[in-house]
UniProtKB/Swiss-Prot annotation:
It comes from Ancylometes sp. Belongs to the neurotoxin 20 family. Keywords: Neurotoxin, Secreted, Toxin. Expressed by the venom gland. This is U3-ctenitoxin-Asp1a. The keyword 4Fe-4S does not apply. One of its GO terms (cellular component) is extracellular region.
Amino acid sequence: ANACTKQADCAEDECCLDNLFFKRPYCEMRYGAGKRCAAASVYKEDKDLY
């Protein structure tokens, strides 16, 4: 898995997950086509802009 700091760092079919078991967020494949990433486990791009 690739490390990420925001959702934009990942591919369109991946989510940027911040998991307590890992030292840093990483890109994880989405579960099912078209499903959105859980907001709580994703770095929100709008907050990264500031």
